[in-house]
Regions:
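Bacterial N-terminal signal peptides
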Residues: 20-32
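Hydrophobic alpha-helical segments and helix pairs
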Residues: 98-148
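Gly/Pro-enriched, hydrophobic low-complexity segments
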Residues: 99-101, 105-116, 215-216, 222-239
Length: 239
């Protein structure tokens, strides 16, 4: 397993990164879920939330796409599971410049443990699938089979090993949702790792209190989180 330094290279919130739009989708999921009170996987079959996504860079803020996040009861390898799904498609200026149709799926056991995740990237003529399969050993070790491929060839086929909390990008939002925010204090930190290709990237959620958000003449009391990512691939992310 690769060693990672704990120097925070990037700190990000939704719509803060100009180079990787899928990161913005992930951050928006995190930010949007913070308006809910969290218990241990407080899920209901058939939950669905639709998002309008905006791309922000400096003073420019333009509509970037549409996303749908849904949860339903399902099965994975014959056992009951939660199926967590995110569909994204670009819109507005982004659609004209760089067409995107991305899908992310997770299967969680009822315990809960992340069992499987898949990200399917469809961007113009580019199509890529990232699959992660998680197996939990008695010693506390987690074995992760990472398989990345296009329609023509395999890009990555390797095993990752870790201990502690490990998720894909979408599964990390499920972890955030499972935290008990009622007893959370300002500055609380929750470290974890994100499995991406051959890498295990160190990250953490950082709680910075409640915030009132106004939208379409309505006010919402939300919980405000940052995600700190300790990897050079996210060095352009910023607050």
């Amino acid at each position: 397993m690769r060693e990672h330094s704990l120097r925070p290279i990037g700190t990000a919130v939704w719509a803060a990164c100009a180079s990787k739009l899928y990161i913005c989708v992930f951050f928006l999921c995190v930010a949007s879920l913070t308006s809910l009170r969290a218990q241990t996987l407080p899920l209901s079959h058939g939950e669905r939330v639709d998002y309008d996504l905006y791309f922000k860079w400096g003073l420019i803020m333009s509509k970037a796409g549409l996303a749908t996040l849904s949860v339903k009861e399902s099965e994975y390898q014959g056992a009951p599971s939660w199926h967590y799904n995110l569909l994204f498609r670009s819109a507005g200026v982004i659609e004209k410049v760089f067409r995107m149709r991305d899908t992310m799926d997770c299967h969680y056991s009822k315990e809960p443990r992340l069992l499987f995740s898949s990200k399917r990237t469809n961007e113009g003529d580019y199509y890529l699938v990232d699959n992660l399969q998680f197996e939990y050993q008695g010693s506390g070790r987690i074995d992760i089979h990472s398989h990345r491929h296009t329609l023509k060839e395999t890009k990555i086929d390797t095993m990752l090993m870790a201990k502690g909390r490990v998720f894909d990008m979408l599964g990390a939002t499920m972890y955030l949702r499972s935290l008990d925010w009622r007893t959370m204090s300002y500055g609380a930190e929750f470290p974890f790792m994100i499995a991406i290709g051959r890498e295990l990237v160190n990250a953490r959620f950082r709680y910075t209190g409640q915030q009132i958000v106004e939208h379409k003449e309505a006010k919402f009391r939300t919980r405000h989180f940052y995600i700190d990512i300790y990897d050079e691939a996210f060095s352009q992310a910023k607050e």
